[in-house]
Amino acid sequence: MISVNEKGLAIIDEMLDWEEDVKIESKVLENGATIIDCGVNVEGGYDAGMYLSRLCLADLAEISYTKVDLEGLAVPAIQIATDHPTIACMASQYAGWRIAVGDYFGMGSGPARGLGLKPKELYEEIGYKDEADAAVLVMESDKLPTEEIVEYIAKHCSVEPQNVFIAVAPTSSIAGSVQISARVVETGIHKLESIGYDINKIKSGFGVAPIAPIVGDDTKCMGSTNDCIIYCGETYYTVEDGNAEELEDFVKKAPSSTSRDFGKPFYTTFKEAGFDFFKVDAGMFAPAKITINDLKSKKSFTSGRINPGILLESFGIKNV
């Protein structure tokens, strides 16, 4: 079976070899753990964002930069293609580990989740558990983790602290923005899973999403980065299903436009909800447009729509 952490460790080695070139900085903590700053106290950039995206997906996807057109304005975008959608996106990339220790908080994603089984139910559903001596984690946080955080992660992953490798970037950084848009395929798979679809039927995934500019603090950037997927993210999946009628119904329910909160920038929705995630419709976290091709029935279905106007409003780009 593929080890996402072994693949992640190979990427870490590459990052350490090229850290000056890609504007990142590593340090080894007293307990031996390696922390790689990709945007907290360093500049980072598109190269750092690409490395974070590769880490999150455990190098089980082809990732490239491209552009999308937003009402005549070309903006940077990221394109993902994978033949290992459940392992790459759900066993690794999905930000399913909420790490809160003392006054430190960060969302954990990437290979280490496959050791800690975060969350356990998901790994049981897809039938995956990694076995590796090293844990590789990507943290979305504005602070670098301490020895205490490393000990917590090492314990949950059953590895020694010196075998913990963590790459970190805040949402309000170029690298952070890139790796969030790189979740476009994963976001669609997660939405399909949440409405009851058997994601083990998904055999490949492809997606494109714009990359948000830095619009403010982490909370505001969380809004614009989510909007990239919600309003302009496009995904295409190949499945082995066979029940075309049922599949058509799932495709209808999958896009973000089915959410009651759809239609305005996410930051506005979040603010109106008193910055309480539990008051925001979870169904909103989905790509704008989803297409599925079924290899068994030979049928294809598409649903959703692109909304560049809302994304431009979220970006706040002034035409001068």
Swiss-Prot record:
InterPro entries: METHMP_CycHdrlase. The keyword Hydrolase applies. It catalyses: 5,10-methenyl-5,6,7,8-tetrahydromethanopterin + H2O = N(5)-formyl-5,6,7,8-tetrahydromethanopterin + H(+). Its EC number is 3.5.4.27. GO terms for cellular component: cytoplasm. It is found in: Cytoplasm. GO terms for molecular function: methenyltetrahydromethanopterin cyclohydrolase activity. The keyword Hydrolase applies. GO terms for biological process: methanogenesis, from carbon dioxide; one-carbon metabolic process. Belongs to the MCH family. HAMAP family: McH. NCBIfam families: one_C_mch. This is Methenyltetrahydromethanopterin cyclohydrolase. It comes from Methanococcoides burtonii (strain DSM 6242 / NBRC 107633 / OCM 468 / ACE-M). The lineage of its organism: Archaea, Methanobacteriati, Methanobacteriota, Stenosarchaea group, Methanomicrobia.
